[in-house]
Amino acid sequence: PIPESFGTEEQLRQKVSEEDLFKEFTSDENGQNQLPPEEGQKVIDRLGGYDKIYRIKFEAEYLKHLAYEGAKERYGAPLPENVDEHVNFELHVMKTMGFPGYFLIVSDFIRAAREELGVVVGPGRGSAAGSVVAYCLGITKIDPLKYDLLFERFLNPDRVNLPDIDTD
């Protein structure tokens, strides 16, 4: 669960308007290249409307917090520019596809398996090993930048399959 010290979804709703969400969810990771209104509305509808998008945004903010904390641990601070760009891009794709909650859940159960239950979890296999965010969250133990692995093989807006993270 997202700790209360991080804030609440209700607090986010008071700070962020539907217009803000529309722009954020229909633009690229740099806030540029916004989709035309009709196409943008299709994105909003596909994600379940604004009630659902507020939840996605809240989860995305916490995921971003955890990912950047992990990035600093793995790559040092200040982050190298290429790492920051990869993390920012991946987080945007995860958010606009509606998957931040999935990554929070997987991160939580991998951490619990390793640290609390003594369950052996593999270092990462399959296309999820191409995610810098998964590496920063501790889901995988393989640095995709070191091995030039592609995030887009794992998750991209043109791929209709749900993300699949192999944990064995």
Which residues does each PLM region occupy?
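Phosphodiester-processing cores and adjacent nucleic acid-binding clamps
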Residues: 1-168
